[in-house]
A protein has these predicted regions:
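Acyl-thioester C-C bond-transforming condensing/cleaving domain
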Residues: 2, 43-45, 65, 80-286, ...
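Loop/turn elements at helix/coil->beta-strand transitions in domains of secreted/extracellular proteins
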Residues: 5-8, 52, 110-111
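Generic N-terminal amphipathic, Lys/Arg-enriched alpha-helix
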Residues: 7-22
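Short catalytic helix/loop segments, enriched in acidic residues and glycine
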Residues: 22-42, 74, 78-79
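N-terminal alpha-helical transmembrane segments of multi-pass membrane transport
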Residues: 45-57
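A short beta-alpha structural unit
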Residues: 55-60, 271-274, 311-320, 361
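A structural motif shared across PLP-dependent enzymes of the aminotransferase-like
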Residues: 62-73
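Long, well-ordered mid-to-C-terminal structural blocks that present hydrophobic/aromatic surfaces
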Residues: 267, 283-321
Length: 419
């Protein structure tokens, strides 16, 4: 894996509030909000005339919103037409792919500054429609005709990990508890409640309805109860990410140009992308993702860094088991050992390797086409020391990583950042 031909930096990043925003807000509205937020994060200001292209990451506005050809639409809204405005699709890794392609384009010298857009409006469809649309990112020859859904596929992955490494349902629950605690501190998150707060709200509602009030001993007891129904064994409701509308915006600039816009650019140290068979049955094993390992290998080689150098990471927790697999595939922990990071607090906000300080997909939300870009927004904030509320980590972040996975691991993008 070669080096970037010239230095590339992130000079601004922003997002809209994630949530069930439709019908009050659609893709155009959310993208403009994210754009404005990102512009406001560029220290010395930036204007459309400064930007050479708009790279749009979007999974399936065609099916969610009956709107294709999204690139020019997003570019036109912020004054970037007639400049290039391609759209990139990689399932849930769509804006991760767009970000990586923008990095490569700037490094090549073709462009000096690119605006990266990640956007998805999912709640225009009912739950059944969302499930069916997401299923188009799985294998259509074998999995889809058999009735496979992503909860079912990740349940199979979780079951395999349980069997091989002794991982338990409680281990997954601890991932969700941690990420809800982080999401509580993120004003842009869809679900800004910790698990204890969710428990308290349910108790209050039961009392108002005159129902028997459950006597949950703690968060784990609550998550084992009928209040957290089984979706696809062993995955329960709170193991699954949210159905979300949202948008995020990143400004990527060449190194010699970046200093015009900020004195504190966040440098792109390395980036990589991997792939795998869409169908689980075609893979050698399913207790990890080969696409993640390949993308990480490329990003580490390009950056000259390794897993031990990373201080903070945003990883793709579309299901709680996915966060555990990501930590192992990225080399942070040996196979079967990542659950210890949850138990002993290493991956908590004040731990030695904070994971998903944004709340992750579990709490921040998962508007699939915007997820990868939103991860970069969180890293930008943490490295700048501007994360809101009580979410800012207690140390100066010099090196960070984002991990954006598509589907059941068919696509992965890993990017490493450095001050």
């Amino acid at each position: 894996m070669g080096k970037l031909a010239r230095k590339v930096a992130m000079i601004g990043a922003g997002m809209c509030k994630f949530g069930r925003n439709f019908p009050l807000k659609r893709n155009p509205d959310m993208w403009v909000e994210a754009w404005i937020d990102a512009v406001n994060k560029v220290d010395n200001g930036i204007e459309p005339k400064d930007i050479d292209a708009c790279y749009v990451g979007n999974y399936s506005s065609d099916l969610f919103n009956h709107q294709g050809h999204l690139g020019p639409q997003m570019a036109n809204l912020v004054g970037l037409t007639p400049k290039p405005a391609p759209r990139f699709e990689g399932a849930c890794a769509s804006s991760g792919v767009a970000l990586r392609q923008a990095i490569i384009a700037v490094a090549s010298g073709i462009h000096d500054i690119i605006a990266v857009s990640g956007v998805e409006c999912m709640t225009q469809l009912p739950t059944t429609g969302v499930t069916d649309t997401l299923a188009t990112a799985s294998d259509d020859l074998f999995e889809y005709p058999a009735g496979a859904t992503f909860p079912g596929l990740y349940a199979a992955i979780a079951s395999a990990h349980f069997h091989k490494y002794g991982t338990t349902a409680e281990d997954l629950m601890r991932v969700g508890i941690k990420n809800h605690e982080n999401g509580k501190e993120n004003p842009f998150a869809q679900m800004q409640q910790s698990i204890p707060e969710i428990m308290a709200s349910k108790v209050k509602r039961y009392e108002q309805q005159g129902r028997d009030v459950p006597d949950w001993k703690d968060e784990i007891d609550f998550l084992k109860s009928s209040a957290n129904p089984m979706i696809a064994s062993p995955l329960r409701l709170f193991d699954c990410s949210l159905v979300t509308d949202g948008a995020a915006c990143i400004f990527i600039a060449a190194g010699d140009v970046a200093k015009k816009y900020t004195d504190t650019p966040i440098w792109i140290a390395g980036t990589g992308q991997g792939s795998a068979s869409l169908s689980l049955h075609d893979r050698d094993e399913i207790t990890g993702f080969i696409a993640t390992r390949e993308a990480a290998k490329q990003a580490y080689q390009m950056s000259g860094l390794g897993p031990k150098d990373i201080q903070i990471a945003e990883v793709h927790d579309c299901f709680t088991i996915a966060e555990i697999l990501a930590q192992e595939d990225l080399g942070f922990y040996q196979k079967g050992k990542a659950v210890e990071a949850i138990k002993n607090g290493e991956s908590h906000r004040n731990g030695s390797l904070p994971i998903n300080t944004s709340g992750g997909l579990k709490s921040k939300g998962h508007p699939v086409g915007a997820t990868g870009a939103a991860m970069a927004v969180e890293i930008f904030k943490q490295m700048r020391g501007i994360a809101e509320r009580n979410r800012q980590v207690k140390f100066d972040v010099e090196r960070a990583l984002t991990h954006n996975l598509g589907g059941s691991g068919g696509t992965c993008v890993v990017t490493v950042y450095q001050k």
